[in-house]
Regions:
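Short His-centered aromatic/hydrophobic patch
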Residues: 70, 86-93, 108
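A short, active-site helix/loop in glycosyltransferases that binds the activated sugar's phosphate group
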Residues: 128-152
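Aromatic "clamp/platform" in nucleotide-sugar-dependent glycosyltransferases that forms part
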Residues: 239, 258
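N-terminal strand-loop element at the rim of the active site
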Residues: 5-13, 17-65
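Short hydrophobic beta-strand element within catalytic cores of glycosyltransferases
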Residues: 34, 275-278, 288, 295-296
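Conserved donor-binding/catalytic core segment of Leloir-type glycosyltransferases
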Residues: 4, 132, 170-188, 194-197, ...
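A conserved mid-protein helix/loop that constitutes part of the nucleotide-sugar donor-binding site
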Residues: 13-21, 183-199, 216-222
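A charged, aromatic-enriched C-terminal amphipathic alpha-helix characteristic of glycosyltransferases
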Residues: 321-341, 345-379
């Protein structure tokens, strides 16, 4: 069975990581059609053994098609592949029409929250044979926003990790190391982690924070740390190609975004016995079990209030999914005070939370199960289209 992967490889986030891992473990014949003009530098070593075709380039040259022709060329290139299924990875491509002789399947990794409800978006979701969702939240966002006539198939993220065998303990009960890892952009709400650290220090709790990742808000986050007198307690360590050292140095993982379809970094932390503090929004309650291996917090801090406290923008003018009410709602962030209280609760029961994190991870790190479920969902769509 042949799969054509339609993907933009300019960035390097969760979807791209999953894509690379899938290619290494796939049982299908795979072809890659890249819609960006170049690869992200972090992807080059990972993809050097794969043949990548570029949607905007003429044959194997560096010459690009004129912009007005690209949607026609893309449609033709998809058809020329003669793939059983064309899998669109987490973006809305510009197509001239529905490609013939292939099932068109969209794989959502969280971008469906952010697509503007334009004609381009609605036409694309209308021409799909089906979609694959990363979580129940992702499935419901597509159904609620785009009124899909098909029911997206849920295949949760499972990472190829081996959970730790031994739970972590706090070697120094008086000192706690917090960690967060993501792109340093508005919607990740990293300012909350810094304000939370400030709250803990006010409560005479010895804490420090390690922030992994790079992004456009790094300078502003460093200024926020200075403004709140916590600069000496924070390490900005930048992008890490190997996260093992980061996870080995932290005791509690902080996930403070305004939206998160299914947190991969949270899954990685739990597999290492690290409890997670997270907002009860979108797919996070599916990734982490509340009061068991982490603590979920109801977001109560409005975006304008966050801006007042941090001088940081969220840049997320969309709604988020509330799993309790099964509705789309205005985005908010968790309050630094609630975050600090939850950290104290975890500290007081640390050994139990850590062991539970490892136990919970046995399901979320069963990568063979992910491959089976993912390929079953793809195969099902091929059967639907060609029956």
């Amino acid at each position: 069975m042949k799969i054509l992967h339609l993907i933009n490889l300019q960035g390097f986030g969760g979807a791209e990581r999953l894509f690379i891992e899938y290619l290494k473990n796939s049982s299908f014949q795979n072809e890659i059609l890249c819609t960006s003009n170049s690869l992200n530098k972090n992807l080059i070593p990972e993809l050097k053994n794969f043949n990548i075709k570029y949607a905007n380039k003429i044959a194997s040259t560096k010459i690009k098609y004129p912009s007005f022709l690209r949607k026609y060329v893309l449609t033709k290139k998809i058809e020329a592949s003669k793939a059983d299924v064309t899998l669109v990875w987490d973006f809305v491509p510009r197509l001239s029409r529905k490609p013939k002789n292939t099932s068109l399947v969209y794989y959502d990794h969280g971008c469906s929250w952010r697509y503007p409800l334009t004609n381009k978006t609605l036409v694309f979701f209308g021409m799909l044979n089906n979609a694959i969702a990363i979580s129940t939240a992702s499935k419901r966002v597509m159904e609620l926003r785009f009124n899909t006539t098909y029911e997206p198939k849920k295949v949760i993220n499972r990472l190829p990790l081996k959970p730790s065998e031994i739970a972590k303990t706090l070697h120094d009960g008086n000192q706690i190391t917090l960690g967060t890892a993501s792109r340093l952009v508005g919607l990740k709400g990293i300012g909350i982690s810094i304000l939370c650290l400030s709250e803990l220090i006010k409560l005479n709790i010895k804490a420090n924070l390690i922030i992994a990742g790079d992004g456009e808000q790094r300078n502003e986050l460093e200024e926020l740390a200075i403004h709140n007198n916590v600069k000496d307690y924070i390490s900005f360590i930048g992008y890490q190609s190997d996260m093992d050292t980061f996870y080995s140095e932290i005791d509690i993982y902080l996930s403070t975004p305004v939206t998160e379809p299914f947190g991969l970094s949270c899954i990685e932390a739990l597999a290492r016995g690290i409890p997670v503090i997270y907002p009860n929004i979108d797919g996070q309650p599916e990734a982490i079990k509340d009061k068991y291996c982490g603590i979920g917090i109801k977001p109560t801090l409005p975006i304008p209030e966050y801006h007042k406290l941090t001088n940081l923008d969220i840049n997320f003018p969309y709604k988020v999914y509330d799993p309790i009410s099964d509705t789309l709602t205005a985005p908010k962030l968790i309050s630094p005070q609630d975050c600090a209280s939850s950290i104290i609760e975890v500290i007081n029961n640390y050994d139990i939370f850590s062991q539970n994190a490892i136990d919970w991870s046995k399901e979320t790190t069963n990568y063979n199960l992910f491959i089976r479920e993912f390929e079953h969902a793809i195969r099902e769509n091929q059967i639907i289209n060609h029956s």
